[in-house]
Amino acid sequence: MVKQQTADRLANPDYIDAPFISNHDTTRISAQCVNNEEQMKFAAGLMMMMPGSPFVYYGEELGMKSSGTKDENKRLPMYWSAQDLSKTPDAPQAADAVEQKFPSAEEQEKDPGSILQ
């Protein structure tokens, strides 16, 4: 990894890496870690320690999950409150209802041990 970053910086001195765990084209980390909260926190911690400007795909900080291979399931609306945990009118029409294991942002803000905190 260091070798690649050194080569990138030599090719472009203004190079800034942009590490990420997942995005709209990939499965969310919660699925990769099978909803294991400690593994998800560890992955996020590693990403934040990498050089560059890390990108957090919306919902990663809550443990939001996607399911299947449909793009629409990777673009579900952010769930700010418990009311948002079911499929909302803002969800893409072809999206499946995806059960979320972790609480909403509103609920996680109150829990000092949550993924968000």
Question: What are the residue ranges of the model-derived segments?
Answer:
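Loop/helix patches that line or flank the sugar-binding groove of alpha-linked glycan CAZymes
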Residues: 2-3, 14, 28, 34-117
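Aromatic-lined glycan-binding groove of carbohydrate-active enzymes
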Residues: 2-24
